[in-house]
Amino acid sequence: NAEIVPQSITDTEIILSLNDAPSQTLQAGIQPLQVLHSSPSSAVPVASNACPFVLRPTVTSVQVAEVEGIDDDPRGGSLQVSAHLPVGANQRVVIALNEWSIETPAVYLFEAPARKQDTTCLTIPFTGVKPGDYLIRLQVDGADSQLGVDTDPSSKTFNWFNSPRVVIE
């Protein structure tokens, strides 16, 4: 838990920056938010009900390791994925691979194995994946990382999702 002083308070809105929260207090996924109102006339602050908000993970890097398979055979191996926020030891983590193709794209979901501690670096094994170029999403307790979009109007892939991507050979 962390106490953050709001940047702005009105009758209908409270604005605060998550950058003011100590980094070890935030994790990807669903977070509780509660308002504590202290008063000079009371030693005990008045607390609001907790309200959930979703903090999306961001994939900062992805690498393929220990790939097995030849020719057109499905591949097995592991993905080493780094996130911008810690993932809790007890949080459910799923990696989604969406083939980057305009034809019928393959889709794969792989659950990360249990972890002994919070981490920003995850190793997720995969099996049965056809060789190809894939968009990758990290899902932590139901909160999906966002995909990047090609914003170059002169590009053949303008407005297509384009990152993060990984090639499985």
What do these predicted ranges mean?
Residues 1-43, 72-144:
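Immunoglobulin-like IPT/TIG beta-sandwich domains and homologous Ig-like subdomains
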Residues 41-62, 144-169:
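Short beta-strand elements
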Residues 62-72:
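Short beta-strand segments of immunoglobulin-like
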Residues 69, 111, 150-154:
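Generic preference for flexible, low-structure residues
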